[in-house]
Amino acid sequence: MVRMVPVLLSLLLLLGPAVPQENQDGRYSLTYIYTGLSKHVEDVPAFQALGSLNDLQFFRYNSKDRKSQPMGLWRQVEGMEDWKQDSQLQKAREDIFMETLKDIVEYYNDSNGSHVLQGRFGCEIENNRSSGAFWKYYYDGKDYIEFNKEIPAWVPFDPAAQITKQKWEAEPVYVQRAKAYLEEECPATLRKYLKYSKNILDRQDPPSVVVTSHQAPGEKKKLKCLAYDFYPGKIDVHWTRAGEVQEPELRGDVLHNGNGTYQSWVVVAVPPQDTAPYSCHVQHSSLAQPLVVPWEAS
């Protein structure tokens, strides 16, 4: 295991992270999330890797297919990454990651239990300058170990992480490589990916809006406003009654549609004898002014 650590860090130096969409203040991020399972779960790979640029997933890899594959709108992007070569890198990172999970399970002598190791690492740039980086692992949802590039050192949060720390700091060069990855290699990869991705991350897709109503016997009428196919994901959807904002009865989260856009909805309840005008208001960065869709009572 000790001899494998520099290999892992070297791979991290070569591999690029994922970047979130650019917003108006010029922020982008690249994030990788790794997940490993200690026990077999039917139809679920033991190891999975996802990469995101800002809030959009752009690649995936798992221990079943062992192929790095672009996702979503990046399926049409050519030249950003050598996915065949990246598959080899991800396989090596998978080996290290799962070996670490095995070490933890053995430390706690709990090979019969079901456990999860997750890792999250990446970097951010703002106005083309590095503005942050992160590299942390979680075991069964709890903090396990984190790299602090200011010290620099791995900071353990779990008794088993002391062993991981010893292995990952067995040679001073291991720590220096981790620091260099966060401060130099990751931002450089992010900038490289942005050359192919800014048109995706900076786009403004206006929302489509649909207003519907439903009334169950003996209940108030429910008005639903659905906004969909918009990007970026920040949006405000609310109902007004005679021009006054109404408290929603239900509000849906902003969710991915699966095509690189989002959807959200809000519901208000209307008393049976209420004849006041209701309208759905939608505010989004793609709109010059709020979109107002009145509910037409039938």
Swiss-Prot record:
Domain of life, per lineage: Eukaryota
Disulfide bonds: 123-186, 225-280
Pfam families, per database record: C1-set (PF07654), MHC_I (PF00129)
Residues with the Pyrrolidone carboxylic acid modification: 21
Tissue specificity as recorded in UniProt: Blood plasma, seminal plasma, urine, saliva, sweat, epithelial cells of various human glands, liver.
Oligomeric and partner information: Interacts with PIP.
Name used for this protein in its record: Zinc-alpha-2-glycoprotein
Source organism of this protein record: Homo sapiens
Phylogenetic placement of the source organism: Eukaryota, Metazoa, Chordata, Craniata, Vertebrata
Gene designation: AZGP1
